[in-house]
């Protein structure tokens, strides 16, 4: 497989706020969404190689055959469908008696200038990136509360900290996911449940293919041609750029967060994510000026 993850848990030095170094002793059960490729697939392998019982899910179960061969349990799961979510969670509870960790990884990026993105596309973006994790979280929380233990890991993005022209819809969905996670952390802490945000920068996956598909379906107004030219450049999006992380880098952070007795609340992954976090503290006029210069240079 091209995205094999490291077979051992390494000390995490990538987090903005690191958790306790102590690892949980017993192998546990994890439910991971969006495992057809990239981060999700690599994360499922990393958990399995560390003796977790892994339920790897995707919209099309046929995309999970290699994970099944590796020892993962697989299931078809559409994060936008309540019945699909309940069916998978009920199966895990019946087979394992509980869910120790939920990794909300499924997602995609709807790029494009705000004016050009139809409302129905915005709704679809939020249905997958925000309402999907919300559905899964609501489904697993009663069981985690009963066990007085559990970890919910939401895979966000540096775009959940910093928005940019052409990325407002995607960033909006990730900003929302971060807000939900912040609130949830305070709500469930008393029940022994941890809520963690993992915030990758660009990652070498097929994520860019979906970006191009979504942008290709937009009306593409001439008024924003410079933004489209930037988005047409694969390296400008970042998926194959020199600062992109590998899926195994993200998988390692997710596994470490799930294995910690006291994980940190946030883990940026990769140089772009770390600098993106710092960019939030740059005065808005200065940040806008830099974006304007970048548009002129790259557009």
Show where each model-derived region lies.
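A glycine-rich helix->loop->beta "capping" turn
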Residues: 91-104, 110
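Substrate-binding pocket helix/loop in short-chain dehydrogenase/reductase
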Residues: 113-114, 121-123
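Residue(s) in the substrate-gating loop at a strand-loop-helix junction
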Residues: 157
């Amino acid at each position: 497989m091209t995205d094999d993850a490291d077979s051992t848990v390494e000390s995490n030095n990538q987090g903005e706020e690191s958790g306790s170094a102590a690892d949980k002793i017993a192998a546990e059960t994890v439910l991971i969404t969006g495992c057809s490729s990239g981060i999700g697939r690599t994360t499922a392998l990393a958990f399995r190689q560390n003796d977790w019982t892994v339920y790897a899910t995707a919209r099309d179960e046929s995309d999970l055959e290699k994970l099944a061969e590796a020892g993962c349990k697989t299931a078809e799961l559409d994060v936008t469908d309540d019945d699909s979510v309940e069916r998978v969670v009920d199966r895990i509870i019946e087979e394992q008696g509980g869910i120790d960790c939920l990794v909300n990884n499924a997602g995609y990026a709807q790029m494009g200038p705000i004016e050009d993105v139809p409302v129905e596309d915005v709704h679809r973006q939020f249905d997958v990136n925000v309402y999907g994790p919300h559905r899964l979280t609501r489904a697993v929380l009663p069981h985690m509360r009963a066990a007085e233990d559990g970890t919910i890991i939401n895979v966000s993005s540096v775009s959940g900290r910093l928005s940019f022209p052409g990325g407002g819809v995607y960033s909006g969905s990730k900003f929302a996911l971060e807000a939900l996670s912040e609130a949830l952390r305070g709500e469930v802490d008393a029940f022994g449940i941890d809520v963690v945000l993992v915030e990758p920068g660009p990652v070498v996956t097929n994520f860019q293919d979906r970006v191009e598909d979504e942008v290709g379906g937009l009306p593409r107004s001439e008024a924003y041609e410079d933004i489209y030219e930037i988005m047409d450049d694969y390296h400008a999006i970042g998926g194959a750029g020199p600062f992109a992380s590998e899926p195994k880098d993200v998988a390692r952070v997710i596994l470490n967060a799930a294995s910690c007795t006291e994980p940190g609340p946030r883990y940026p992954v990769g140089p772009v994510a770390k600098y993106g976090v710092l960019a939030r503290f740059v005065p808005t006029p200065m940040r806008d000026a830099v974006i304007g210069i970048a548009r002129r240079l790259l557009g």
